[in-house]
């Protein structure tokens, strides 16, 4: 299992429309092979980030291979759709997180 993390900063004026689009985008991604789940977070506003909303999406995939397949076969088209609709209205960064260790409370 890996986590594909997508960090989005969207202009406040377009945040509602972006979130609506993002919900559809995530549902579409979750139909692709290897995608297991997605969690969406809204970061609390920081002093230097008052004109943008920061959204973090953590996709869980069954393998690195599934992510590579998505990036090669689906990502270019899906990313182009976001650019067409929201050009200049958001910034995005992505990273891949591989499991290292899981520590669980002893009483669980």
Residue ranges and their predicted role:
Residues 14-40, 79:
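Short amphipathic alpha-helical segments
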Residues 4, 18-21, 35, 59, ...:
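Aromatic side chains
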Residues 13, 65, 77:
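Short alpha-helical
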Residues 31-32, 62-65, 102, 106:
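A short, structured loop/turn motif at beta-sheet edges
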Residues 2-9, 41-73:
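Short, well-ordered beta-strand segments in beta-rich or mixed alpha/beta enzyme
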Residues 39-51, 80-108:
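Glycine-rich beta-strand-turn "strand-cap" elements at beta-sheet edges
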Residues 23-27, 57-60, 76-80, 89:
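Short, low-complexity, polar/charged sequence segments that are solvent-exposed and flexible
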